[in-house]
């Protein structure tokens, strides 16, 4: 029998995956879950595509030119693959909402791509990857019959620890609202709510891995209506009360919400749960009832403003962020002024604003009376100046206050740490407190998007 000389053996190098993620927090979560799936196949993540064996581009289709960004990336990857030696092959995959929307068109325009996978098929990634390695071109953009979340592996605790003490947890996916500007119902499908049991188990996995703050995710997260173990249907408020009882969890958040699904039980949770952070992203898109109707938002501006009042009455320290679209088809100067009035009434801590761009397949793409681009530009600039003023006002209003901060990571300088304020903004503070601890700080100053604090004597 021939003996193996240990000196001539070397460990097999782990396979490396690089994932480029575009878009929303759910895409970030999806990329993390794909990483978890691949870790069971021997893959480790790398921060550079140059030494990757597998590159996945996780795409977003919400805004214009999303597909163009993808094809630009794929052009660079084509050159990278050409420069590879035979002993260092490269597999390329496209995932996310552009994958769902474009499908086979991606393979036609970019033959470098080996697999195209829609958001509902991530639980099959290891299996589909093996087929792609055998030379097959893979397209999987069907909506899964089975529950994809039930087939995803448990979180990789080591990977979770590397990501930090805050984590995303998807509880709901898809949307049934069919706003006329939005592609989400077509790329993510109908609303799916995970069960209470699934969510609780994943939350416990994250907590065991050191997570202290969980943000519940959904395209329409407050539309979540999951089944409990006894067969009852819970709403998001019920779920928040339930998760708040988990040992080791210090903070809860959720995003993104639709005004129509902000029910009284959810508002009560903001009143009753100190660990539910006083920050809410509640998009309205426009302040004009005429435009809201054209967008199929299913509410009027007065409903939204009344909702803001109810939430503030329940949680006076809450901060609101929002989304706004300018230049929707048919938007007049008067419609735009209604949006400005609404913003002035609400007083946002931050907001996202965009020029309308028609998305293929949506009702909005078939509408007439398009607004001139120069008018869109002027309106967007006007709106953003106002929103920036409100953001700065909010930041200045917190100077001199005391607040609790979740310490997340070391800062740039020795003895400095970066934490997360209740209002989501980062806080820089000189402290020896460990990552994951919650400390009280005194806000001394504010920049354009962060606070500077000092420890109190508490």
UniProtKB/Swiss-Prot annotation:
One annotated Gene Ontology cellular component of this protein: cytosol
Cofactor note: Binds 2 [4Fe-4S] clusters. One cluster is coordinated with 3 cysteines and an exchangeable S-adenosyl-L-methionine.
Matches recorded under SUPFAM superfamilies: Radical SAM enzymes
Binding residues annotated for [4Fe-4S] cluster 1, in chain numbering: 24, 60, 97
Binding site residues for [4Fe-4S] cluster 2: 175, 179, 182
Cofactors required: [4Fe-4S] cluster
Pfam families: Radical_SAM, TRAM, UPF0004
Keywords: 4Fe-4S, Cytoplasm, Iron, Iron-sulfur, Metal-binding, S-adenosyl-L-methionine, Transferase, tRNA processing
Catalytic reaction annotation: N(6)-dimethylallyladenosine(37) in tRNA + (sulfur carrier)-SH + AH2 + 2 S-adenosyl-L-methionine = 2-methylsulfanyl-N(6)-dimethylallyladenosine(37) in tRNA + (sulfur carrier)-H + 5'-deoxyadenosine + L-methionine + A + S-adenosyl-L-homocysteine + 2 H(+)
GO molecular function: 4 iron, 4 sulfur cluster binding; metal ion binding; N6-isopentenyladenosine methylthiotransferase activity
PANTHER family for the chain: CDK5 REGULATORY SUBUNIT-ASSOCIATED PROTEIN 1, MITOCHONDRIAL TRNA METHYLTHIOTRANSFERASE CDK5RAP1
Family assignment from sequence similarity: Belongs to the methylthiotransferase family. MiaB subfamily.
Subunit structure: Monomer.
Name the record gives this protein: tRNA-2-methylthio-N(6)-dimethylallyladenosine synthase
């Amino acid at each position: 029998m021939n003996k193996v000389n240990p000196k001539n053996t070397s460990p097999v190098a782990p396979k490396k995956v690089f994932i480029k993620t575009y878009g929303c927090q759910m895409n970030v979560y999806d990329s993390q879950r794909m990483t978890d799936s691949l870790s069971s196949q021997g893959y480790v993540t790398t921060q550079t595509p140059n030494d990757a064996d597998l590159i996945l581009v996780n795409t977003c289709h919400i805004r214009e030119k999303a597909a163009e960004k993808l094809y630009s990336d794929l052009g660079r990857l084509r050159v990278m693959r050409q420069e590879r030696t035979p002993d260092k092959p490269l597999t390329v995959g496209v995932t996310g909402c552009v994958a769902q929307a474009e499908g086979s068109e991606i393979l036609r325009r970019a033959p470098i791509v080996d697999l195209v996978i829609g958001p509902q098929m991530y639980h099959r990634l290891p299996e589909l990857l093996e087929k792609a390695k055998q030379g097959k071109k893979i397209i999987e953009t069907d909506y899964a019959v089975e529950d994809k979340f039930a087939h995803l592996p448990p979180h990789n605790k080591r990977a979770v620890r590397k990501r930090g003490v805050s984590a995303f947890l998807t509880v709901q996916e898809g949307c049934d609202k069919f706003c006329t500007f939005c592609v989400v119902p077509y790329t993510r499908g109908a609303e799916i709510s995970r069960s209470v049991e699934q969510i609780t188990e994943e939350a416990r996995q994250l907590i065991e891995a050191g997570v202290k703050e969980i943000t519940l995710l959904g395209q329409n997260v407050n539309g979540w209506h999951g089944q409990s173990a006894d067969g009852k249907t819970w709403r998001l408020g019920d779920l928040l009360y339930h998760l708040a009882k988990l040992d080791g969890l210090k903070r809860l958040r959720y995003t993104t919400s639709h005004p129509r699904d902000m029910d009284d039980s959810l508002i009560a949770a903001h009143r009753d749960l100190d660990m539910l952070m006083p920050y809410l992203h509640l998009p309205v898109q426009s302040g004009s009832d005429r435009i809201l109707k054209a967008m199929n938002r299913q509410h009027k501006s007065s409903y939204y403003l009344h909702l803001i009042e109810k939430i503030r009455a329940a949680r006076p320290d809450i901060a609101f962020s929002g989304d706004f679209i300018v230049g929707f088809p048919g938007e007049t100067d008067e419609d735009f002024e209604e949006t400005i009035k609404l913003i002035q009434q609400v007083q946002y801590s931050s907001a996202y604003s965009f020029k309308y761009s028609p998305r293929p397949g949506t009702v909005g793409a078939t509408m007439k009376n398009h607004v001139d681009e120069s008018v869109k530009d002027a309106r967007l600039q006007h709106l953003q100046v106002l929103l920036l003023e409100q953001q700065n006002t909010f930041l200045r209003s917190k100077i001199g206050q005391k607040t609790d901060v979740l310490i997340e990571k070391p800062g740039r300088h020795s003895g400095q740490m970066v934490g997360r304020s209740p209002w989501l903004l980062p806080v820089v503070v000189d402290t020896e407190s460990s990552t994951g601890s919650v400390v009280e700080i005194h806000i001394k100053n504010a920049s354009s998007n962060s606070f500077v604090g000092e420890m109190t004597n508490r």
